[in-house]
Design a protein with these regions (language model features):
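C-terminal segment of N-terminal export signals and the immediately downstream linker at the start
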Residues: 29-50
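Extracytoplasmic "Venus flytrap"
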Residues: 46-67, 90-96, 119-120, 193-204, ...
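Solvent-exposed, acidic/polar segments of extracytosolic/periplasmic ligand-binding ectodomains
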Residues: 295, 368-428
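Extracytoplasmic ligand/sensor domains, especially the bilobed periplasmic-binding protein
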Residues: 112-224, 274-299
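Short, charged, surface-exposed loops that flank catalytic or proteolytic processing sites
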Residues: 352-365
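Beta-alpha junction/loop-to-helix N-cap segments that form part of ligand/metal-binding clefts
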Residues: 57-64, 76-153, 227-234, 259
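N-terminal secretory signal peptides
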Residues: 1-13, 20-27
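Extracellular/periplasmic periplasmic-binding protein-like sensory domains
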Residues: 145, 265-341, 353, 408-427
């Protein structure tokens, strides 16, 4: 922040909203000025994630990640001064409306300098929209870039002002799935399960989603249409897949929906050779809840202990980060662990490089110029499919039985050859 007190003029965005909406006068600017010029200045980071509700698996490792990086965030040097990064976390309750509400609270009441979010479009999009409306620097992950960008009505030639995202895209997951399915003993007939939500509408989109590239690759896709999340009856979809002779089932589902579908599929005699589902099959707890019917299911793999990347914050390898979580929690590692950690790697890097931490525009400029290596791979917003987006590598694999339990094994890496394969896909 500049010494002449211009922080009270953070544009006609955030401050004007604060004064109009909350009836605050100069106090917020004074408080921020005091924070910035204190002997041990603090940057406040708002953090939104689904701690409760059907997406809670994505936030399972939150406490571990924040505790493990607390020391690293307690002293980050910027322009010769040591800054402390204070993280204020709020629960979206797996509800996009609630995500927007808590994001607004973080921005307008807690006066955060940066806001971050992860875990599907239901969290990422409403948080990003609140940040964009208020001119607040925002970094997000854990959501394919198309539902993030186009789900927010983004225009590729314009992008956004203050909101930035790193993750893979639908082109990557489609490529990984097609590579996974390339078995001559399996008919190229696919049943698609796409919910009526941001993810489902993006994955099922005729042009940007699965239908066109599957057709171009020679696959016949049966798409019975969008179903409502938390549905209790998938009989229509199962009947359509059986009639079409589908030997592959794919889509994007929340865990409760897949559990319902897979149980009813067994009861109604649907026997696909390959089942590859996005989102629902990321978590060991979900696969374990399916019993023997969980073995052999397949999914995208964003991050694993075998990924050849390390943390810029702690120096840990992917293997060390995963093992640390397992020891501390007595639970299996999960894929979001790497991305939650990387989110704060990027925050710390931005805090180090920003020319003036008292000015949102300076923080946004530092985000835009990010070019770093994280535990999930490179993050560089000068390279991306559209403005404000940069991509991370993606592979795919299968839940296989090892040592008496289900383990996620990378079985194809054509989309990211630097990530090693651990086995071959086994048909159901």
């Amino acid at each position: 922040m500049s010494s002449n007190g211009n922080n009270d003029n953070r544009g006609s965005t955030r401050r004007s909203v604060l004064r109009a909406g909350l009836g605050l006068l100069a106090a917020p600017a004074i408080l921020h000025f005091t924070r910035a010029y204190a002997k041990s200045p603090t940057i406040k980071v708002g953090h939104v994630s689904p701690v409760t509700g059907p997406l809670a698996g994505f936030a399972e490792a939150n406490d571990y990640i924040l505790n493990s990086i607390r020391k690293s965030l307690s002293s980050v040097e910027n322009n010769g001064k040591s800054w402390s990064i204070e993280v204020i976390s709020k629960d979206s309750q797996s509800n996009p409306n609630r995500a927007a509400e808590v994001a607004a609270d973080l921005i307008l009441k807690d006066q955060v300098d940066i806001i971050v979010a992860a875990s599907t479009p239901d969290t990422v999009n409403p948080v990003s929209d609140q940040a964009e409306a208020n001119g607040t620097p925002c970094i997000t992950t854990d959501c394919p870039w198309q539902p993030y960008f186009f789900g927010r009505n983004g225009k590729p030639d314009q992008g956004f002002e203050s909101t930035y995202h790193f993750f893979w895209g639908l082109e990557d997951v489609i490529g990984a799935f097609l590579s996974l399915w390339g078995n001559p003993n399996v008919a190229q007939k696919v049943g698609g399960l796409f919910p009526n939500d941001a993810d489902g509408n993006a994955w099922g989109d005729a042009e940007r989603g699965f239908p066109r590239p599957l057709k171009e690759a020679g696959y016949a896709l049966t798409d019975p249409g969008r179903y409502q999340p938390m549905s209790d009856d998938f009989s229509a979809q199962i009947s359509a897949f059986k009639a079409a002779g589908a030997e592959i089932v794919t889509g994007n589902m929340i865990p409760p929906d897949f559990g319902t579908f897979w149980s009813q599929a067994g009861q109604q005699g649907l026997k696909p050779r390959i089942v590859t589902i996005g989102k629902a099959l990321l978590f060991p707890s979900v696969v374990a809840s399916l019993g023997d019917r969980g073995i052999g299911l397949s999914s995208e793999i964003w991050w694993s202990p075998n990924h050849p990347f390390s943390s810029s914050l702690t120096g840990e390898s992917s293997q060390q980060l995963a093992e640390g979580y397992v020891r501390a929690s007595n639970r299996p590692w999960t894929q979001p662990i790497g991305f939650k950690h990387a989110l704060f790697e990027v925050v710390a890097d931005v805090v180090r490089r920003a020319a003036d931490l008292g000015e949102p525009a300076s923080i946004i400029e530092a985000i835009r110029k990010t070019n770093m290596k994280t535990i999930v791979g490179p993050v560089d917003w000068s390279k991306g499919p559209v403005k404000n987006v940069t991509k991370t590598p993606l592979v795919a694999g299968q839940w296989q039985r090892a040592n008496g339990k289900a383990e996620l094994v990378i079985t194809t890496n054509k989309t990211a050859p630097e990530i090693p394969v651990g086995g071959e896909l086994k048909l159901l």
